[in-house]
């Protein structure tokens, strides 16, 4: 069963095309890496797949729903780690997750468990603005999994995570459908079964089995 089906996804910023005619089909439980240089369109594609942005044209179905019409319903089923963590710097790590619990209708008892999973129990009371870049990234990842989403959309989640970052991501991705943007081909090869290469907003060929991409 395909969790994501995209046809002709195109996005313009003014007179500049950021994404052009992208077709995708991603099955349940599949992990796909999106590769490309800066400005290739990776972030734009992931924001659209996370329902954080609308394409200028094209069709997108996620979990059988029209993603352009059912964004609110789908956001409860999608975990999104954006390119920037997007945390509340004055709130503690715990308070950031508790606030998200309130928005998503998640039990706050899950907060301590989630902080432990991402390795932040010892800094639970520290303001997010005082955390290191790697810790902030871990907190953003924790927020993305707090509501146990079926689909994870991760924009360079490995940034500043440290030596055990790949292990953390592998554990969190298990049993979920994942779209992951990264510059790290070794990480993509370890975590994903397929890759989509973007160049100037266009797909370079069709999504490929990763062992063919060097």
Placement of each model-derived feature along the sequence:
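Catalytic Walker B motif of ABC-type/P-loop ATPase nucleotide-binding domains
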Residues: 152-156
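Conserved structural motif at the start of ABC-family nucleotide-binding domains
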Residues: 4, 19-21, 75
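Conserved ABC ATPase "signature" region
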Residues: 98, 102, 108-123
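Helix-to-loop junction immediately C-terminal to a conserved catalytic motif
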Residues: 50
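The feature captures the beta-strand-to-loop junction immediately N-terminal to the Walker
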Residues: 35-37
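Conserved ABC transporter NBD signature motif
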Residues: 58-66, 74
